[in-house]
Amino acid sequence: VDSDIDPGYREIKGRRWRISDPSIPEPLRQQLVNELMSARRAVAAANRTSNAIALRTARRRVQSAKTALGERGPKWWRPMNDQEWTVRATATLFSLLNNRQANASLCPSEVARASDGRHWRKRMPDVRLLAEEMTHTARLCITCRGEPVSISTRGPVRLARGERFDDYFSGENDA
């Protein structure tokens, strides 16, 4: 594979492998890699115990982390349309939050930077809209100073786990 022609792949031992998006800031990339490794360990553990539900959940976590890293899903080296960006941003949001402690939150700009590094500023309104949609399913909670608020709240907001956060990985209530 000629990386000048197809920059999203690298050939290793004769096989093409999709590489991570190099525009993801290093601290966020590392968090996503940590989530991917944790999810892979969860797949192995579920396989050892023959737990089908845990296996499905762990595989969804792997898919989400790989999509957030740009290794699956929309091709990061090509311009993404809004639908493709939403797929990647959703995976990024849930993977970053899942990698953090249960009571932790993240800044909307972290989602924007990791999901569309080159154009993250223009994606900020999109992240806020995506977050608002996730509050309707209780998968996400928008907070300011630790208190739930509306997305229309002026000033800095944070994104935290909602009551049904885990439904994203379990597949419950998939639309």
What function would you assign to each model-found segment?
Residues 1-9:
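Short acidic, Pro/Gly- and aromatic-enriched capping/linker segments at domain boundaries
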Residues 135-144:
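A short, conserved structural fragment
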